Amino acid sequence: VHGVSRIFATWFDVRVTPSGLCQLFARQAARAAPAVVEIERHVRTSGVVGMDETTIRQNGDLAWAWLARTDKASLFRIELSRGAWVAEEMLGKDFKGIVCSDFYGAYTRMGEWEHGYCNAHTIREAKKIAEVTGDADAVRFCERLRSIFAEGQKAQVSGDADEREHVRRRMDYLIGSTRFSHLPDVTRLQRR
């Protein structure tokens, strides 16, 4: 808060003490509490929740900014931990929806959660496998995966049920294909 106090003084010629800022933040937190409860309830009862976390510094200490978001709301939380308990607390013990995330174990270890992995992370992983192995089949897998995701986005926007079903069939075929069985990393990605 000392830095914020200096910014107000330097940039806006407004004098506010660090303790004054702390009091302001506490009042704002109290006012926002009902909205936070409403957002938590919405997230915990949603059918699909995207989750992610990123490293930040808090008072010089390593911390994580956590995000649980739906199409209508975003719930943020700062913790000094990257442990699975944070995700569990954010979603609540009775969460029954789908968690869309990267491959981090805090999300995948919850057996009762259904998982929908983030398309960008999945494509990035497939691309990395193709680059590292240099195998033509790994490249082919990555290209097909990208194509299916692109087609899936178009089908989702169009709302056409037949198009979405076609994309599902293509994905099922790619996931079930044994053509890539000589590539353990591709096989691992297929199982996800």
PLM ranges: what are they?
Residues 1-192:
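Catalytic center-proximal scaffold of phosphoryl-transfer enzymes
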